[in-house]
Amino acid sequence: MAHQPPNRPPLIGDPSGPAPPYPFRMSGLVISGFGRGSKELGIPTANLPVDDAQTPWISSIPSGVYFGWASLNLPASHPDSLTSSAAAAAAAAAAAAAPGEDGGGAGEQRQRGGNGFAVYPMVMSIGYNPFYKNTVRSAEVHVLHRFGADFYGVEMRLLIAGFIREEKDYSGLEALIADIEFDCEVAKRSLAREGWAPSGVDVEVDVPGEGVKVLRGSLECGWLIRPDELGEGGK
């Protein structure tokens, strides 16, 4: 597990779920970013365009690190697509190996998404990233899943459930990476609670100190897998 920095709580929010004004919604096609997430940080990001017209709330929220859920409509040719043969085989093996966290028995089929969308935990930065001296506000999403290939141009939807911390500058790259790694752990712990996990779909979260859990909670996240809603970015 990542080292816990001073004055950093391990969890965000009440166990019952996100509090107003959350959750926020954001969607778009994944675009190329600054190219440093994987190369310098070892933390790949999937960027979305920042559009004040589509997401009017984004200009008024603090710059910083947020967390929540991401859904991706990956093409069948992508190794992580819900319809790819590799993903289907992996899902079948996982379902046969152990019971689901929602009480399902061994061998029960898990519903990872719908309408081609799969749902994953995520942590994201909205802001200017002072360490890199950005002059344009960006939305950089780190989906908490190890993907077998890139997915530029794919539709991604975000349900932003809460705020972790404000952005800040760092004296060096190691300090930045340490904070990001702890952000990821905070997101995983927070999202693994019943009030924060999606209802209607099963999601996998690699909870620090506990391992991978398959969860189904009570948070309404139907928008993440609803068809034909690209461009919706409101509350």
Curated annotation (Swiss-Prot):
Cofactor note: Zinc or magnesium.
Sorted UniProt keywords: ATP-binding, Flavoprotein, FMN, Kinase, Magnesium, Metal-binding, Nucleotide-binding, Transferase, Zinc
UniProt GO molecular function: ATP binding; metal ion binding; riboflavin kinase activity
Cofactor: Zn(2+); Mg(2+)
Gene3D superfamilies: Riboflavin kinase-like
One GO CC term on file: mitochondrion
EC number: 2.7.1.26
Pathway this chain belongs to: Cofactor biosynthesis; FMN biosynthesis; FMN from riboflavin (ATP route): step 1/1
Gene Ontology BP, a term: FMN biosynthetic process
Enzyme class, broadest EC rank: transferase
Signal peptide: none
Recorded catalytic activity of this chain's protein: riboflavin + ATP = FMN + ADP + H(+)
Binding positions for Mg(2+) per the UniProt entry: 45, 47
Stored Pfam families: Flavokinase (PF01687)
Location of the active site: 140
UniProt similarity note: Belongs to the flavokinase family.
Function statement: Catalyzes the phosphorylation of riboflavin (vitamin B2) to form flavin mononucleotide (FMN) coenzyme.
Protein name, UniProt field: Riboflavin kinase
Record lineage: Eukaryota, Fungi, Dikarya, Ascomycota, Pezizomycotina
